[in-house]
Curated annotation (Swiss-Prot):
It comes from Xanthomonas campestris pv. campestris (strain ATCC 33913 / DSM 3586 / NCPPB 528 / LMG 568 / P 25). Keywords: Hydrolase, Nucleotide metabolism, Nucleotide-binding. This is dCTP deaminase. The active site is at 138 (proton donor/acceptor). One of its GO terms (molecular function) is nucleotide binding. It comes from the Bacteria. Belongs to the dCTP deaminase family.
Amino acid sequence: MSIKSDRWIKRMAEQHAMIEPFEPGQIKHDAAGQRIVSFGTSSYGYDVRCSREFKIFTNINSTIVDPKHFDPGSFVDIESDVCIIPPNSFALARTVEYFRIPRDTLVVCLGKSTYARCGIIVNVTPLEPEWEGRVTLEFSNTTPLPARIYANEGVAQMLFFQSDEVCETSYKDRGGKYQGQTGVTLPRT
């Protein structure tokens, strides 16, 4: 299994719609020329953006967090260019990009250093072979202060690993519960 380069990522995006919308270069400035957190193709990965759709965790219901019986009322939904995450809390978002993962490929997501250096951690489970959809992102604010996330700017990097052997059973074959998700998706069992 080897990590894939920018050439492979570009080819797969352009010929097989692996990433839509796709940016073949690194975007570091907005339309007005202001610096942003970069997104697009990097040497050995792809930096994704989060959309304007956020779910901010709140404890207004004083409930127990249970992944088997998750209460959607534990979130406040917002649509904005900026998301403020309360201290020691978290928020969910989704990528702008839609992914179609090849059957012989596994994708691992890592947070961007710009956010990590501010105490904001991005967590995403691997994108499995033949999974497709928009990725639900989890941002943890590990600081005792409110933290800001910017929509339509880079938030995480996807690394693509291609196996030397095609898997016997893909995520699609298993009927994975998050297959085809397009919005911010809460836990499912």
